[in-house]
């Protein structure tokens, strides 16, 4: 289990907000009344001379590569702020090249692969494999030196398996591996 203490900037202090969480595969859920104290800390009760402030510590469980999403919204929805964190990332860094996977569908039936630290518009050799299926592609990094791809790792006739992504450039070769399908999701 991980715990997050949330802060906000650029929003009015002392105004009522609602704190939301969004678990993958379900609808967003309102979980608490929220206010922003003068320091930007999100609390469920503002302190005063007679009352102690009560910060909201969001506790969450997660699987590897699972994003936790939070939002605060004003009562009239004109003000909104969003945050996300991946408490247990599936990631690898080699020679400044960073590659990571975020679960985008339950049981890793869909993932988003992201990379950074590549040279602007650099040629990338991307090797995707899931079971005995896969292949290599020659692609280019973005002008910012990043890479993003959505992957559906399922293999016909299989209920589960392992997938891997390797990106190679002249300066680095970085790889990540992740399970998918039945039994792949495990709380850390």
Q: PLM ranges: what are they?
A:
Residues 1-188:
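Extracytoplasmic/secretory-pathway segments with low complexity and glycosylation-like composition
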């Amino acid at each position: 289990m991980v715990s997050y203490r949330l802060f906000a900037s650029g929003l009015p202090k002392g105004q009522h907000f609602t704190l939301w969480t969004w678990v993958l595969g379900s609808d967003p859920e309102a979980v608490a009344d929220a206010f922003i104290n003068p320091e930007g800390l999100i609390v469920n009760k503002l302190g005063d001379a007679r009352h102690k402030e009560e910060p909201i510590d969001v506790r969450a469980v997660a699987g590897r590569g699972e994003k936790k999403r939070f939002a605060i919204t004003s009562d009239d929805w004109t003000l909104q702020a969003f945050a996300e964190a991946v408490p247990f990332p599936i990631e690898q860094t080699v020679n400044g090249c960073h590659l990571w996977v975020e679960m985008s569908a339950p049981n890793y039936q869909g993932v988003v692969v992201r990379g950074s630290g590549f040279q602007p518009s650099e040629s990338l050799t991307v090797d995707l494999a899931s079971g005995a299926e896969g292949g290599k592609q020659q692609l280019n990094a973005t002008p910012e030196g990043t890479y993003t791809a959505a992957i559906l790792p399922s293999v016909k006739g299989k209920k589960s398996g392992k997938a891997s992504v390797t990106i190679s450039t002249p300066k680095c070769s970085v790889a990540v591996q992740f399970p998918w399908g039945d039994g792949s999701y495990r709380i850390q």
